[in-house]
């Protein structure tokens, strides 16, 4: 009875979540039609379908701009080619420890290797594209023996979410289809419904079966127990059409294992809005104008014809070089255009260009491609960097939300999995009980922080100018602190920065070497003087013998 009640509750909540999501579906469907026809699952059977879906797209400017947005966010936030985050303790004194720095750097490198080996980067790119189009994205992060973690990327319409009172997503239901072979391999034949077992026995392995996966907080659990039935989140797979006493699998997670970012939220909304929603009107206008332009070109290149009545039911050739015989002497004889076709398309073409630019701006394509589209080849590197940073500041709010709803949870989930898999290097003794923080050092994150480096650069430059007049002003400048602060602003690998205690030791060794060299030089000078004095002949009359005799009492 408990399982039956649990299953009914899950089906009931799935229905409630679908009802809550329903108002978004038509909007997502329209965005899919005009921007990403292959994305979106608005019916559970919408999988692995190869029919033509791009019929509404006459001008693909919107699709290409969305592709630039996804690629720009991928390269700017989570580029596989460079480190985009680092771990810190948020305790400055502890961060200065060489052992702590080395351990944090090793863990960061290990985590980046896990991301590269798994499908993390492919999932992130898919999520960025979904965010730009539908405003909400989702990926379930599950443990994997070979790659440590594995992502199940979802698309709009395939899932429904709910949030807690702080607006954080804590519930995800998804409805999807898998083949009979996949279901039996994943859950076991005994767990499947009698219908699936019968299909498997008949060899219908490629028959599609609907499955619902529910992830939500577990209300009835015993925190003192550590088994999967008492973890903070429960995970249940079941067939909606099977008998009410059967579930495919019930387990649990210590934390919410789904990434559910939203591009931007308004008020208490659960699902986010997106650049595609803002640009949808322009995208539809562009398709309409391209259709009218094509019709106008058809009128000019293939105008309607007016023929005499005598030509009715006669063979008329309208192909280039064709011959037609008509009675030209009759009134209105001959073949001529039905009306004068002299359409001016310049205004339409100008508006098409304007609409295209608006669409690109909505997707920040001008931002990500501003270097490629630059018109001034004489710009200095400093001018290019300043323009780059100024434009990237427009992504500040989005970047903060992506850090909070994608990257922070992703790193935390991966770190937890590394602990469970026992692949972390042993931490230094001084780190016991210390919480770790994530600091993002991607190109976009650094662009947000680069304003601080500009002020530091101006200060150092002006200080150097003043030092040319009054050198003692350099006594106010702490070069060691400048090196550490500037390296932190730029996200430099801590292994490239020598710790302060090692710097003090190096300077002491250098001072000792300089002092020893000075002493050696003095000794060499004294020995050279003694050698010169020792070579003087004191038996003859000279200044040295005169001085020696004077001190000896001789005249």
UniProtKB/Swiss-Prot annotation:
InterPro entries reported in the protein's UniProt record: Connector_podovirus
GO cellular component, one term: virion component
One Pfam family here: Head-tail_con
Main location: virion
Function, as annotated: Forms the portal vertex of the capsid. This portal plays critical roles in head assembly, genome packaging, neck/tail attachment, and genome ejection. The portal protein multimerizes as a single ring-shaped homododecamer arranged around a central channel.
Subunit structure: Homododecamer.
Protein name in UniProt: Probable portal protein
């Amino acid at each position: 009875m408990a399982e039956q009640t649990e299953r009914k509750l899950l089906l009931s909540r799935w229905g409630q979540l679908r009802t809550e999501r329903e108002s978004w579906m038509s909007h997502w469907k329209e965005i899919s039609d005009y921007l990403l026809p292959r994305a979106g699952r608005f019916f559970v059977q919408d999988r692995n379908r190869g029919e033509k879906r791009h019929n509404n797209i006459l001008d693909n400017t919107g699709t290409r701009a969305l592709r630039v947005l996804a690629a720009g966010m991928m390269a700017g936030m989570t580029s596989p080619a460079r480190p985009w985050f680092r771990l810190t303790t948020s305790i400055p004194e502890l961060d200065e420890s060489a052992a702590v720095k080395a351990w944090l750097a090793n863990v960061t490198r290990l985590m980046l290797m896990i991301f590269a080996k798994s499908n993390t980067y492919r999932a992130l790119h898919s999520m960025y594209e979904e965010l730009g189009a539908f405003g909400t994205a989702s990926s379930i992060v599950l443990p994997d023996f070979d790659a440590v973690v594995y992502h199940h990327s979802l698309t709009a319409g395939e899932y429904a979410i709910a949030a807690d009172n702080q607006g954080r997503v804590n519930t995800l239901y998804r409805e999807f289809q898998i083949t009979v072979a996949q279901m039996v391999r994943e859950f076991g034949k005994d767990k499947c419904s009698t219908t699936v077992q019968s299909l498997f026995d008949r060899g219908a392995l490629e028959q599609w079966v609907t499955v619902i996966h529910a992830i939500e907080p577990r209300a009835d659990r015993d925190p003192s127990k550590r088994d999967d039935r008492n973890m903070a989140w429960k995970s249940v797979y079941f067939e909606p059409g099977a008998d009410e006493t059967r579930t495919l699998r019930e387990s649990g997670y210590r934390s919410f294992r789904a990434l559910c970012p939203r591009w931007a939220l308004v008020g208490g909304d659960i699902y986010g809005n997106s650049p595609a929603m803002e640009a949808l009107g322009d995208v539809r206008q562009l398709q309409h104008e391209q259709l009218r332009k094509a019709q106008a070109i058809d009128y000019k290149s293939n105008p309607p014809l007016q023929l005499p009545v005598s030509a009715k039911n006669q063979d008329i050739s309208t192909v280039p070089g064709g011959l037609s015989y008509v009675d030209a002497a009759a009134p209105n004889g001959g073949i001529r255009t039905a009306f004068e076709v002299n359409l001016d398309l310049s205004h339409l073409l100008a508006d098409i260009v304007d609409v295209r630019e608006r669409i690109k701006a909505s997707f920040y394509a001008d931002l990500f491609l501003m270097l490629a589209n630059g018109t001034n080849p004489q710009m200095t590197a400093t001018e290019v960097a300043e323009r780059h940073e100024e434009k990237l500041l427009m992504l500040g709010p989005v970047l903060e939300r992506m850090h909070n709803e994608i990257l922070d949870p992703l790193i935390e989930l991966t770190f937890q999995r590394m602990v469970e898999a026992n692949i972390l290097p042993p931490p230094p003794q001084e780190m016991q009980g210390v919480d770790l923080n994530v600091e993002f050092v991607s190109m976009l994150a650094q662009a947000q922080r680069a304003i601080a480096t500009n002020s530091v650069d101006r200060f150092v430059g002006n200080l150097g100018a003043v030092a040319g007049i009054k050198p003692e002003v350099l006594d106010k400048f702490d070069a060691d602190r400048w090196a550490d602060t500037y390296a932190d602003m730029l996200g430099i690998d801590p292994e490239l920065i020598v710790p302060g205690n090692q710097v003090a030791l190096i300077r002491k060794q250098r001072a000792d070497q300089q002092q020893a060299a000075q002493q050696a030089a003095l000794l060499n000078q004294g020995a050279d003087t003694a050698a010169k004095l020792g070579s003087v002949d004191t038996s003859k009359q000279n200044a040295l013998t005169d001085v020696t005799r004077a001190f000896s009492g001789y005249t």
